[in-house]
Design a protein with these regions (language model features):
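Terminal, low-structured helical/coil segments at or just beyond the last alpha-helical repeat
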Residues: 85-137
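Residues that mark the junctions of alpha-helical repeat units in TPR/alpha-solenoid scaffolds
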Residues: 28, 64, 100-102
Length: 137
């Protein structure tokens, strides 16, 4: 309840420690899922992944598919595209059309971003090799 109050007041830095304690004591995974969402909002991506995975493992979450979407987004931010797509595909199996549509959009976005990142890396490598050849010439 206290964490919800802080969260609603946009006092996320105060909500997180309260939720961390509540998640440890809770018999349900939902508190970890909420904590993972807040971590993601705060760009604490690795913490987000750990919290959401802990919540899913613990079970008793409101929407497993919604948690998988957020977990996919966290992996996407880390450029773990394969794991992100895996989570999005799992979420896309949900009966809720809204979640399914969102998950499928994320899959396409992750696929495109993965190609873009690989192409940038190839381009960067090519430029570095070209500069090295010029220096050695």
């Amino acid at each position: 309840l206290l964490a919800d109050s802080w969260r609603m007041a946009q006092e996320i830095d105060k909500a997180i420690p309260v939720l961390e304690q509540a998640a440890k004591m809770s018999k349900e995974g939902e508190t970890y899922i909420l904590l993972g969402n807040l971590y993601l909002f705060e760009d604490r991506i690795e913490d987000s992944i750990r919290a959401i995975e802990a919540g899913l493992k613990k079970g008793k979450v409101k929407s497993e598919s919604q948690a998988q979407l957020v977990l996919g987004q966290a992996h996407f931010e880390m450029e773990n595209f394969e794991e992100a797509k895996k989570q999005f595909r799992a979420a896309a199996r949900d009966k809720d059309k809204r979640i399914k549509k969102t998950a499928n959009s994320w899959i396409k976005y992750a696929e495109n971003e993965e190609v873009r990142v690989k192409n940038l890396a190839l381009r960067r490598d090519f430029i570095q090799q070209s500069k090295a050849k010029e220096t050695n010439s």
